[in-house]
Amino acid sequence: MAVPKRKKSKSRRNMHRSHCRLRVPNIGIDKTTGEYKLSHHICLGGYYNEKQVLEVDTSGV
C-alpha cells in the first residue's frame, strides 16, 4: 500500500480540494421579461441579449 513520504501541508491539501465544492449558479434577471434566468442562456420568453431569437407558443397547448 502506498504511504506518503512527507506530510502534505494544509495549504497544499486545500489547493488539492479547491475544485471539490458546491458552486453558486450564475443567475440574473432578464431585462425584457423581468424573470430570473441563467446567464448566457435563453429566457422562457425566447429572448437572448434583449433580442427575440425564438418564437414562443403562448397558447398553453
Swiss-Prot record:
It comes from the Bacteria. SUPFAM superfamilies: Zn-binding ribosomal proteins. Keywords: Ribonucleoprotein, Ribosomal protein. One of its GO terms (cellular component) is large ribosomal subunit. Transmembrane segments: none annotated. GO terms for biological process: translation. GO terms for molecular function: structural constituent of ribosome. NCBIfam families: rpmF_bact. Belongs to the bacterial ribosomal protein bL32 family. This is Large ribosomal subunit protein bL32. The lineage of its organism: Bacteria, Pseudomonadati, Pseudomonadota, Alphaproteobacteria, Rickettsiales. The gene is rpmF.
